[in-house]
Amino acid sequence: MSFKDLREFIDHLEQKGRLKRITHPVDPAYEMTEISDRTLRAGGPALLFENPIGYNVPVLTNLFGTPERVAIGMGREDVKELREVGKLLAYLKEPEPPKGFKDALEKLPVFKQVLNMPAKRLRKAPCQDIVWQGDEVDLDKIPVMSCWAEDVAPLLTWGLTVTKGPNKKRQNLGIYRQQKIAKNKIIMRWLAHRGGALDLRDWMETNPGKPFPVSVAFGADPATILGAVTPVPDTLSEYAFAGLLRGSKTEVVKSISNDLEVPASAEIVMEGYIDPNEFADEGPYGDHTGYYNEKEKHHVFTITHITMRKDPIYHSTYTGRPPDEPAVLGVALNEVFVPILQKQFPEIEDFYLPPEGCSYRMAVVTMKKQYPGHAKRVMMGVWSFLRQFMYTKFVIVCDESVNARDWNDVVKAMTEHMDPVRDTLMIDNTPIDSLDFASPVVGLGSKMGLDATIKWDAELATRPQISKQDSKVITEADLESLKQQRPEIIDIYLPPTTNNRFAVVTMKKDQAGQSQALMEYLWDFFAQYTDNKFVILCDEDVNARDWNDIIWAVTTRMDPDRDTTRVSGKAESSSKLGLDATNKFESEVTREWGTPIKKDPKLVAKVDEIWDQLGIL
């Protein structure tokens, strides 16, 4: 199953009941976000808004709003088949020569796929049916979405940004958010380690002061779009990978104003340049973390040409607290990552990036442990092997018998097999996502590795295993009494698999230092009943019994080193870790804390009024 362009993909989804056309007039300012968010959270279809208020261009959202649609876009029938995509990428990253004639025959299907890799260059293409240039260039004619009430400006989200470094043979495709600031100008927000930013850096070194050519394509075929978000080897272009997924060469055409090649079937293409000396303040925007980010200086992209197909479709999305479309993509791409990691670390049984952890800030790994210290080697491997995991703050490693995708199973392993202080690896001053406001410094923070594997004798030398102790039953009456003694406590959850040695507590936090004081009180309380090892403190907006809420709070509101309390063990009791996943007061941190995204009640009520008319679900 493959699709030559976005329109063919739309037709297929519509035939299968996976896309809904919305004929009711809908405003790109906020309304589309609210409708798309409701639809995605309900596992609903892709949406094609045919009558955006004030515009003649339809808007496509929620295209990859379920893992199944991501798999279909990659030419697969089922999400599980994405493991085969990962195996192919692992092979291309480190190809093995055939061991003989029989092995060569077995590898023949792979070689045939590789033949589809080079892009096919066209002289004319649908994406250049209509051309705007000079004063005709006008972003106000395109229904760019405004997503959240406190966003600074409309935001372009799904553009495939095409760049080429001066010393590179191939182009780079990347997806970066872009703030609209004028009819012909947007701010290009790309992080320093991303391909586009690296190409610009190299360009400025070899062509100081000269404009850097850039093209941005919206609405390419699904294989090309997904190729831009997949961890392809550095030696393989995204166009080539898209050809592998599709089973046919990716058709491209040279941009009108520069030498960059863009997808021939793209709906809309923006061409222009970045002046190395032109910057602007980007943000704040509500982001995939569920918070508004800080302002940052980024380069400005000046658009000199806009080309498009006849009757173009504008492809867009929104980002917000998981689940959103990036989180769904993360769930699907997780299956691609597993074989790539297993090629380098065959001992890995499973690898899971929970979407509630913003799809990259936490990883759970299960493995076949073969020697002392093996779990820590795997932690280091996760952090260093793929660029995608550079910003993963927490890595939990468990034995192969543990279900990495079941939090009750994971915390059971943590309480049974960890001495928390001994088996926790903390690394300071490591690269961190600049959107992570919990880090002490922009772009720099700590990482935590938790070894929840069964320990070998050598690993017990510094801290012998504490013999299992019987736990007294903690009754609801006991917990109610605790709440009366500490009225700031909202709820207490003791996961049933942890024998009362793991607690999640939500609280009403009123002042700095309050969470640390409560943590100490809780350990004294639990000591009456059990050898408690872990306490996680969260704010009252978190449901203590919902792992989605808990993991989201841990990954967005903690710097692991600063916000973890360590208590050394005693002869008769284990060491302890306290994780403070509460929002921090100004005196507790060194930079501005994030503001959570909140929906506008008036907007919600307005969409409520038309929801049934839309007939989406």
Swiss-Prot record:
Task: Spell out the protein name for this chain.
Answer: 3-octaprenyl-4-hydroxybenzoate carboxy-lyase
UniProt KW Mitochondrion keyword: no
- List the cofactors: a divalent metal cation
The protein's matches in Pfam families, at most eight in alphabetical order, are given as:
UbiD, UbiD_C, UbiD_N
Describe which pathway this protein belongs to, using the record's wording: Cofactor biosynthesis; ubiquinone biosynthesis
What does the record list as GO biological process? ubiquinone biosynthetic process
Q: What is its EC number?
A: 4.1.1.-
What this protein is reported to do is described as:
Catalyzes the decarboxylation of 3-octaprenyl-4-hydroxy benzoate to 2-octaprenylphenol.
Q: How does it assemble?
A: Homohexamer.
The UniProt family comment states: Belongs to the UbiD family.
Q: Where in the cell is it found?
A: Cell membrane
Molecular functions (GO terms): 3-octaprenyl-4-hydroxybenzoate carboxy-lyase activity
Specify where the region named Unknown insert lies, as residue ranges.
460-588
Naturally occurring in which organism (per UniProt): Vibrio parahaemolyticus serotype O3:K6 (strain RIMD 2210633)
Keywords attached to this Swiss-Prot or TrEMBL record, sorted alphabetically, are: Cell membrane, Decarboxylase, Lyase, Membrane, Ubiquinone biosynthesis
Give the CC-aspect GO terms: cytosol; plasma membrane
- Report the membrane topology from the UniProt record: Peripheral membrane protein
InterPro entries per UniProt: UbiD, UbiD-like_C, UbiD-like_N, UbiD_Rift_dom
